[in-house]
Amino acid sequence: PILDDCLENNIKIISNIGAANPIGAAKRIIEISKKQNTRKPKIGVVVGDDLLEYMSDTEILDSPTMEGLDFSNNNITAANVYLGAQPIADALAKDVDIVIVGRTVDSALALGPLIYEYGWKQKDLDLLGSGTICGHLLECGAQVTGAYFADPGFKDVPNLANVGFPIAEFSDDGSFVITKPEGTGGLVSKATITEQLLYETHDP
């Protein structure tokens, strides 16, 4: 069981599996740990993305982010904002085993642990930028190891059925290497990295 392996080897787990109910997800993990007879994990839960807990429908509709959208004839069933990396770093600083978040900017799942591990501050813009790029490369899993790049007959990628998920090996100077588990399918190359780097990158 992966959970037991991580707990026994002090491998932190950070995930946005909380979706609309991070607290519920944490409770479910506790249930799983009991069934698997692992030690009880210490879980940090990041909340705050659900605007309905803090704002009325009118306040949400009047906010600048809603400009140009007409929801006047509809009830708001959900309104969430993206949280950033700092809450993840703060949770890790409390010596938790697992951090569960809800709606979070994708790159924060990598940047948060890096902020915690290296003690980066807001002034460390180059390092934060490097961590953000690392998170962007990892955010879609196997896209960076060839799944996004693959175009059979034009851009062939070996053994996609057994594609390896990416691993980032990060250094304290902000440099990092993207690789994948040995013996897995897929491809890590300048081309696969470049395609994922440009993914969802728009004209600023």
Question: Where are the model-predicted features located?
Answer:
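Catalytic or ion-translocation cores adjacent to nucleophile or general acid/base/metal-coordination motifs
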Residues: K34-L51, L111-P152, D156-V157
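Catalytic alpha/beta core domains of metabolic enzymes, predominantly
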Residues: G68-A85, A89-A93, V99-V101, V105-G135, ...
